[in-house]
Amino acid sequence: MKSRARQCLLVCLLCLSLTNLSYGENKFRERKATDDELGYPDIDEDALLNTQCPKKLELRWQTEVTSSVYATPLIADINSDGKLDIVVPSFVHYLEVLEGADGDKMPGWPAFHQSNVHSSPLLFDIDKDGVREIALATYNAEVLFFRVSGFLMSDKLEVPRRKVHKNWHVGLNPDPVDRSHPDVHDDVLEEEAMAMKSSTTQTNATTTTPNVTVSMTKEVHGANSYVSTQEDQKRPENNQTEAIVKPTPELHNSSMDAGANNLAANATTAGSRENLNRNVTTNEVDQSKISGDKNETVIKLNTSTGNSSETLGTSGNSSTAETVTKSGRRLLEEDGSKESVDSHSDSKDNSEGVRMATVENDGGLEADADSSFELLRENDELADEYSYDYDDYVDEKMWGDEEWVEGQHENSEDYVNIDAHILCTPVIADIDKDGVQEMIVAVSYFFDPEYYDNPEHLKELGGIDIKNYIASSIVVFNLDTKQVKWIKELDLSTDKANFRAYIYSSPTVVDLDGDGYLDILVGTSFGLFYAMDHRGNIREKFPLEMAEIQGAVVAADINDDGKIELVTTDSHGNIAAWTTQGVEIWEAHLKSLVPQGPSIGDVDGDGHTEVVVPTSSGNIYVLSGKDGSIVRPYPYRTHGRVMNQLLLVDLNKRGEKKKGLTIVTTSFDGYLYLIDGPTSCTDVVDIGETSYSMVLADNVDGGDDLDLIVSTMNGNVFCFSTPSPHHPLKAWRSSDQGRNNKANRYDREGVFVTHSTRGFRDEEGKNFWAEIEIVDKYRYPSGSQAPYNVTTTLLVPGNYQGERRITQSQIYDRPGKYRIKLPTVGVRTTGTVMVEMADKNGLHFSDEFSLTFHMYYYKLLKWLLVLPMLGMFGLLVILRPQEAVPLPSFSRNTDL
């Protein structure tokens, strides 16, 4: 009996250890974003507008573009005329360029393409003609290049599909985390899966069957490969529920069927015409699942890909808007099947009577207001009187040949080629020091439910279930050959999993080990944080595990020790700081989804670096870079979700000596917030629109003050002027300031061309000088970030027959002003001087200015013509007779 008891005890202990192995705990995934379940406070408009610290913003201009602006625009001088332009990636079909002075559209723009856009534009000279083209990564995995005239070039980069085994998902371990053996291509796979299933059923009958996911890491061109498996998330037991009815899930990134209970930050506003997916998942309330202690109703998320008229909130007119309304203005057309399902709207917590303060209004109209739309419901009259008068008129028949069509799929019995999609901005850098620039693209692979809702398209796939194939990879292109250099395959999952294998955020490139090669950092929605070298090899101790990572990984010196730290955030409200070796420094739980990577800077002016984090609950947190503690008086509470990256900028007026930075952001309550860093005193501007894109800053109108650029989901672009003087290091022209810098540069670190040489001018002779200044004001104990590797490049377009890129490199060991001698080309043309600097940690800083060469030679010709005439006139005056001589008279002599 004793031996049997011992055997039973050993078996129980073995089963318990296996259970703990298969369902390993992770502190980041176990936490919940509880603040997202709370309602937003009511807006006191009088208190907001009657601020005690006005920033005195003035609206300089406002322009409407063709559709919603989801990705952050780019500020640049694209045609080397000395004037800044704003490159706006409209969400649907168009890339636009606005003149910074007045917001007018430049001639030749907008430029058309067939896809949607989730990424910001970049500048790169793809054809080596001395003029940088505008690179735009599209949703359908193409990187297009546009000339400054708006012409779409034939050169483009195409991301190949990912090939996976058709039955890769069959027999997988549920929620695997044991990485000691692969979960695919394993002979004993089915036996282990059946044993685990039976063990799970016996030990925990009340636990719901977990979803199946697997993380794969495999280099396609290498000899060695491995497969790593990762636990999605422990299913909720007892008092833990899958999803709560209170925060009605919002449909973000709906082309990936975002039916999970997360607020995916990488999506369009639900209900807009340009929604990434016109499918709405239906939330079915399972009344049989009631939490015992919290008494909260559990909801089950239907993963159906079909268009549903049973939307949360206003389901009544879902189908009519889609089937009847076929003509109207593109920006204003309503589509009920894509109705807004805001997680903090009126459907949430109605029992508590909390009024939601947001500009996302899902409520019905009053009778008088509703009657005013009767004319618009006369569809026949509307088509006759309205259709042909507007350039944004929508007739679905006219757009049939302009929509994207996927290429033919390869027919295979054993494998599936998954469509590639790009949901974030690529990065351009020379990661391997070969002198050739590479483009690093984070790619998500899946079958778009909207596209394959068409039976003809679905038929091409051979009857597979498209929900079983979601994957992610890093694809690196050689920009000289325009070919794929290498591919690193990362995660692989199904759509039914708690965590799915998308990549929503741009990769970050930085030198982690000081070898001069750039490493690639990326976080995936599968919850894994990868760090790989310039060849795609995963670094030791990586990947690190968190919940779904939506924001970019930030590489910066956050604790002022002179070394790079890595900061990651996730959808469960976690933020963590790591060393470059993957060791945790500190972590904090903010209790709300973090949609974007944090911004770095000395916010309160105390000489120490802070980490500033936006959340979907509306709270803006300022954390100490040393230990992650909350800096008071933060968090600052807005009245709507904050879904964009925060701008940190010095808005001090001329002569003002205040320390600290201003936090600038938009919120889903329709206000633009300007929060004083040291005091959190706030000034607001009522723009009445929502925004996912970052607020940008620069002197775009040619004056001497700093301007703010705000773009919205309604397709409006605003330019606000501030009384703060402009400085090149205050400018924030793109979300990553060129490559990998998420930190404020002014009074911190950077390089810029001095005011004496950055002005637009004409150069003659054989050489000219450019003066730069390196700024490095890191404080003790870190010291300086030297050495500084400065590369100066002169881009020469036009009819110049020599080298179009004239490059000089110099290493400086201390900050200060330096003069660089550059050659003057012997033709009449324009030019752009780019100054790029990388410090010892590989952080990238840049500045640029434009100039002309020999453009005013006709002034010399003018003097060559005028001077001889003036000389002759002078000689006539000098050589005139000195004595008076009577003039001949022709009068008649009357004496004769």
Swiss-Prot record:
Q: Does the keyword Glycoprotein apply?
A: yes
Q: Which UniProt keywords apply?
A: Cell membrane, Cell wall biogenesis/degradation, Glycoprotein, Membrane, Signal, Transmembrane, Transmembrane helix
Q: Which residues lie on this side of the membrane: Extracellular?
A: 25-858
Q: Which residues cross the membrane?
A: 859-879
- Which residues are the signal sequence here? 1-24
Reported tissue expression = Mostly expressed in buds, and, to a lower extent, in leaves, roots and seedlings.
Recorded hits in SUPFAM superfamilies, A to Z, give: Integrin alpha N-terminal domain (SSF69318)
Ranges of compositional bias, category Polar residues? 272-290, 300-326
The ranges of region (Disordered) come to: 268-354
Q: Which top-level group of life is the source organism from?
A: Eukaryota
What molecular function terms (GO) are annotated for this protein? calcium ion binding
Basic and acidic residues bias: where?
A: 330-352
One GO location term (cellular component): membrane
Point out the coiled-coil segments of this chain: none
Q: How does the entry describe its membrane topology?
A: Single-pass type I membrane protein
One GO BP annotation is:
pollen exine formation
Q: What happens when the gene is disrupted?
A: Male sterile. Defective pollen wall pattern formation at early tetrad stage; delayed and reduced primexine deposition, as well as abnormal rippling of the plasma membrane and no production of spacers. Random sporopollenin deposition on the plasma membrane along the microspore wall.
Its recorded name reads Protein DEFECTIVE IN EXINE FORMATION 1
The beginning of the lineage is:
Eukaryota, Viridiplantae, Streptophyta, Embryophyta, Tracheophyta
| Gene designation | DEX1
